[in-house]
């Protein structure tokens, strides 16, 4: 971890740990990819342009703001088993469908300037990329949950949590 954090653009690497009784990855492969999660668009770069990170301890305040539009950037199955109560489920099968969903929403220019767009996903990757797309589309007040749902569930006491249901992960944790 120390070595990875010494690399350019990885200084603030957010490492996630979770315990498991059995091997979480039956067959682990490590591949170098150009993108971790593809949106299918070349001009979207969260390193150059992204929304504002919101730490888990500040997330509930953003959700309680009436000017906040909360968007779940995960696929339909993930949304169906758990989400934040007031979130919008885009009903997408995969992340590449997210831009098309946004374009169908017909947000007004006033909405783009005044509404707060808050997005979340499992670990923070899809919502960070989605925030870059939203900024690219002219939205000014774009936020995403730092570390994703997993970090929120790790840090926020269940009594204060606004999460309802389960959080799907792609392994056997």
PLM feature spans:
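Rhodanese-like catalytic fold shared by cysteine-dependent sulfurtransferases
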Residues: 1-52, 65, 75-118, 125-173
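Short hydrophobic beta-strand that contains or immediately precedes a catalytic carboxylate
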Residues: 69-73
